Amino acid sequence: MVTQYKNLIGGKMVTTDQMLDVVNPATEQVIGQVPACGKAELDQAVAAARAAFKTWKNTPIEERRAAILAISGAIKENAEELYRLLTSEQGKPHDQAKGEIYGAAGMSAAQSTLSLDDEISEDSDTRLSRTRRVPVGVVAGIVPWNFPVMMAIQKIAPAMLSGCTIVLKPSPFTPLTTLRIAELIADKVPAGVVNIITGEDSLGPLMTSHSDIDKITFTGSTATGKKIMEGASADLKRITLELGGNDASIVLPDADPKKVAEQLFWSSFSNAGQICVAAKRVYIHEDIYDELSAAIVEYAKTVTVGDGAQQGTGVGPIQNKKQYD
């Protein structure tokens, strides 16, 4: 029987009548179902976040730090379950999934230590210039499918630390691990501070145009980023857009072809190449072009492509059919 996962709204795990299937990209089998949220559920999540903000914005920063550390601890304590689940929905090999899970735990712990103290840029006889960071309000976080857990934490922890509350939307392709984390932290974070809802891509525009959301943080494609900027312009929402890259590798003639071949391969094909900083262009000096090209081919032959859950797999499947096509 397929496991049905629930959303986190106002401190409670809730569901909807309609569900979305989540598929293992290696086997193409349905491995879970998640709520198909629409405007009504979004309104509930935003209302919960708005209500929680009234208290959370005044919560002492040490208590906010403690709540973030509780999230970090929950991820670390359940790391094996989480990285196996992540592999099943995203496709990346276990060692890479393990790196993402432990990386998310470490990132949240590190972000809990960031300083929000006032910064004095001038203190003279005639002028005092001070920068003070104040909570923005309710944040909408929209997360991609290539690093779903890392990107979720990268949005949740800073929002919490700064005194904001958040409504997070995972990708419909990879929501399971994030929802499992939601279940683990539901009793560790004050109700409404973190809300996690799932839905089709159509849920995103409802978030970006919602009148009671103050800031949007998005990681994904440049094309979608443009649409978010357009939607946010109606009421001048604050936005943070982390969009696709176009990274290059440049190889000089004194490089060791055998050593560089391995580095170039993984800079391009780690996570099946589904990384914004993946090398998409390679410039090789003509003096070593042939030798390095041959070395890359030979190294690629040693890498196993397959199910990320199988031991020895180096490169997992492309995550979804749209990306594959």
Which residues fall in each region the model found?
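N-terminal Rossmann-like NAD(P)+-binding subdomain of aldehyde/semialdehyde dehydrogenases
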Residues: 1-127, 315
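A conserved hydrophobic position in a structured secondary element of the catalytic/binding core
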Residues: 23, 220, 284
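Conserved C-terminal structural/oligomerization subdomain of aldehyde/semialdehyde dehydrogenase
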Residues: 27-33, 213, 250, 304-305
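Residue-level signal for inorganic ion chemistry
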Residues: 28, 64, 86, 163, ...
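Hydrophobic face of alpha-helices
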Residues: 46, 65-72, 83, 105, ...
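Structural signal for hydrophobic packing residues in well-ordered secondary-structure cores
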Residues: 53, 57, 72-79, 83, ...
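Rossmann-like NAD(P) dinucleotide-binding subdomain of oxidoreductase/dehydrogenase enzymes
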Residues: 119-259
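ALDH superfamily catalytic-core signature
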Residues: 223-325
